[in-house]
């Protein structure tokens, strides 16, 4: 008997900007109940990959399945089950924290009592209770990041996509965010997190993919990555990362199939 579909499947994803490759032949699978890390140097293609997964970018080729559904064919069917925190967030300065999360919750069509209970819990856990009625323009960078994170999880998503979620957040706030991430997986959901904080990724993620120059250099548990990098058993994720992202680490991928386009080409 076949088990449930993986939370997320990415198949042979390609994306170019002005003819320059950003993502080349990416394939990965995220299991239910796991935290999957996406790490790589600047410009490796992590953010582009995540934007395609959440439907903000269209790939040149490839397929993305969420709970077995092709999101390119059904772009709205899956979105209620996904939470997304982009790398760069823009929040409405002249709303309060309460007003902003209320707005997000209503967009998500959350029942009023459920929304209010969830907001109270998130404000408490993220240490935003005191400033919750202050205008966002008065928030520090770390407070804004925590509020944006709260917006991404307000509806208790089954698939949470996080792009550099801990930037500018103090240690206590980082701990709270990581606890909420673990709560998602305890509920049977899945999390994909892109981060440059390798020590955090090593402790938080069940499996990881190392991206380099638009391709995946290695993927698996830390033990798997150590094997791919041919390092010792005591090697840290940083040691493995540096070895795998050396210039010769990733072979040039083959070109995507010719004359097969998901979207019409301009005349």
For each feature predicted by the language model, list its residue ranges.
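Conserved catalytic motifs of ABC-family nucleotide-binding domains
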Residues: 156
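Helical segment within the ABC ATPase nucleotide-binding domain
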Residues: 174-187
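Catalytic Walker B motif of ABC-type/P-loop ATPase nucleotide-binding domains
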Residues: 160-164, 169
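Conserved ABC ATPase "signature" region
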Residues: 102, 106, 113-131
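Conserved ABC transporter NBD signature motif
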Residues: 62-73, 78, 82
């Amino acid at each position: 008997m076949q088990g449930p579909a993986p939370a997320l499947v990415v198949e042979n994803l390609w994306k170019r900007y002005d003819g320059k490759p950003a993502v080349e032949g990416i394939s990965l699978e995220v299991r239910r109940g796991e935290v999957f890390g996406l790490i790589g140097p600047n410009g490796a293609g992590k953010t582009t990959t995540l934007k395609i997964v959440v439907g903000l970018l269209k790939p040149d080729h490839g397929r993305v399945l969420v709970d077995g559904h092709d999101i390119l064919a059904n772009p709205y069917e899956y979105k209620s089950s996904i939470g997304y925190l982009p790398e760069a967030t823009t929040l409405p300065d002249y709303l309060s924290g309460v007003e902003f999360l209320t707005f997000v919750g209503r967009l998500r069509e959350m029942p009023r009592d459920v929304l209010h209970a969830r907001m109270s819990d998130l404000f408490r856990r993220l240490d935003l209770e005191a400033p919750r009625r202050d205008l966002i323009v008065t928030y520090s960078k770390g407070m804004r990041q925590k509020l944006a994170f709260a917006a991404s999880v307000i509806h208790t998503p089954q698939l949470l996509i996080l792009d550099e979620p801990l930037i500018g957040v103090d240690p206590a706030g980082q701990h709270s965010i990581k606890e909420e991430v673990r709560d998602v997986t305890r509920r049977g959901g899945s999390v994909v997190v892109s981060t440059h904080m390798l020590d955090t990724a090593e402790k938080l993620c069940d499996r990881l993919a190392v991206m380099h120059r638009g391709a995946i250099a290695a993927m698996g548990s830390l033990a798997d990555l150590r094997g791919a990098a041919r390092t010792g058993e005591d090697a840290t994720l940083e040691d493995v990362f540096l070895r795998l992202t050396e210039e010769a680490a990733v072979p040039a991928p083959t070109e995507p199939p010719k004359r097969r386009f998901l979207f019409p080409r301009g005349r």
